[in-house]
UniProtKB/Swiss-Prot annotation:
Gene that produces this protein: nusB
Name the UniProt record assigns to this protein: Transcription antitermination protein NusB
GO CC annotations on file: cytosol
Pfam families attached to this UniProt entry: NusB
Matching Gene3D superfamilies: NusB-like
SUPFAM superfamilies xref list: NusB-like (SSF48013)
NCBIfam families (UniProt xref): nusB
Protein's GO biological process: DNA-templated transcription termination; transcription antitermination
Amino acid sequence: MSSNKINKKSIARIAAVQAIYQNILQNNDDMDDIMQNVLSFYRNDSSITNLTGNLKISLSISHFKILVKSVFENINKLDEIIDNHLTNDKDPAHMPILLRALLRAGIYELLFYPTTPAKVVINEYTDIANDMLNGYEIGFVNSVLDTIAKEKNKIS
């Protein structure tokens, strides 16, 4: 990147995955508390500077909040969609937490953000997966999101 700046929606997506992950890990239903914890990290300049050097990072707070709240309002439907894309030999209970968090956010955006092109959503979440997951899981994220994008009209 030439500008040392990352798109605000990209950062919001990463932060949303972090909040969703934190919810699963802590089994904490207080989403407002979780969102405030994640937002406080991104608002703390010293936290960000230590991780990024001179890279400018800020997130779209509105995109973050809408995405996180909407995922939790639709969590059962999203988990059903995820579980339906597992092969018969995969137990949904054994899916890695981070993988489930990322898929929840990505699937929600594919199904309920019609103004964002599917290709953008797939690329964004595959990039996030590339930074957070292993090779098989990255391919799985790409495959599931691509399949859902193609089946979108049947699902939503």
